[in-house]
Amino acid sequence: MTLPSVIGNAKNKQRSAALKKAYTTLYQAIMISTQENGDITEWELPPYHASGMLDWSNEYIGKYFKIISACEDNKTRCTNSLDRICNAENPSKCSSIGMHTALYVLNDGSHIYIFSGGNPVNGKSKVLHILIDTNGTHKPNLYGKDVFTFILSLLNNDKPLQSWPSASENSRNILLNTCQNDSSQCSGLLQYDNWEFKKDYPW
């Protein structure tokens, strides 16, 4: 095995461990919250894309994290955080981290972003988008590399936290093709592969 291969394998193991740890932290927080706050389908989100996401997140999820800081709209209060995250397949294609997004800076340096998503009904959504940035402000800050997308559905009490796309509802071939075409949709493939960055992982 060549030295670059050894280095690459070591980096992938580090990435795998960081993602698995962050996912476990998030999943455990949600499970504890369901024990204390009841059925997740009864949780009430704030209005779609409105202020109050940090207060909501603190009540239902954030208080179970070990954090350095947390903030909502003015992210510079708690970190020199990113305003946007770009795609691995096209670094010029970026997504803004919008207003009304709760940001948690965990004590291991990882970041968790929480914001409403899906199709709102009567001004409210039952879906949250969650981004995990496994190494915070450190580079590369690219989807598929160190930033991964998850969905929290308040309509599904059995499997509320889902990778995107879902690892349990798609074949590996579909997950791989999806990840190859859009680096913001790679968490499903990684969860399917037990959070390992396998040889055919595109990013």
Question: What is the role of each PLM region?
Answer:
Residues 1-30:
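Amphipathic alpha-helical segments typified by the pilin-like N-terminal helix
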Residues 27-46:
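Alpha-helix exit/C-cap motif
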Residues 49-203:
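Intrinsically disordered, low-complexity regions enriched in Pro/Ser/Thr/Gly and acidic residues
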